[in-house]
């Protein structure tokens, strides 16, 4: 099983507002950057999209260490998801889970991989986190300025 290191981030100019996401995948000394955005989104949606797109890009089962500065993503997938599924996509308080379609997509994308979800403090000097932060922010700016290609 291949070992892949993944770094993800999402960005939003306003919340909601133009959004961008980015992922850096590292395998055997090689790197691949992924990035995209939406004209109107939220920061949480962009954080989810970064993880989804990184995992959906992989064509075979992998051992992954996924670094995110989003507690929402890390806790959602590692702690909250089982309860949401048991309660038919309701929170502990009985409300519908926000971004359900993205959570379902992320859940599906995780099934064939072994993933170690790691939280990294954002804007704290981690070079890979800073790199994906810049990529995601540039995508959000491109969305805002009408320059987006994705």
Swiss-Prot record:
Per UniProt, Mg(2+) 2 binds at 9, 133
Q: Does the keyword Coiled coil apply?
A: no
Compartments where found: Cytoplasm
Question: Which CDD domains would you find in this protein's record?
Answer: RNase_HI_prokaryote_like (cd09278)
Question: What positions does the entry give for Mg(2+) 1 binding?
Answer: 9, 47, 69
Q: Which GO terms describe its cellular component?
A: cytoplasm
- Subcellular location, principal: cytoplasm
Might you give the EC number(s) for this enzyme? Answer: 3.1.26.4
**Coiled-coil regions listed in the entry:** none
The cofactor required is: Mg(2+)
* A GO biological-process term: DNA replication, removal of RNA primer
The cross-references to Pfam families, in alphabetical order and at most eight, read: RNase_H
Give the keywords, sorted: Cytoplasm, Endonuclease, Hydrolase, Magnesium, Metal-binding, Nuclease
Cofactor info, note text: Binds 1 Mg(2+) ion per subunit. May bind a second metal ion at a regulatory site, or after substrate binding.
Q: Which reaction does it catalyse?
A: Endonucleolytic cleavage to 5'-phosphomonoester
Enzyme class, broadest EC rank: hydrolase
Q: Which Gene3D superfamilies does this chain map to?
A: Ribonuclease H-like superfamily/Ribonuclease H (3.30.420.10)
Identify the PROSITE patterns for this entry: RNASE_H_1 (PS50879)
Q: Which SUPFAM superfamilies match?
A: Ribonuclease H-like
Q: What does this protein do?
A: Endonuclease that specifically degrades the RNA of RNA-DNA hybrids.
Subunit structure comment from the entry: Monomer.
Family according to the record: Belongs to the RNase H family.
The protein depicted here goes by the name Ribonuclease H
- The gene name reads rnhA
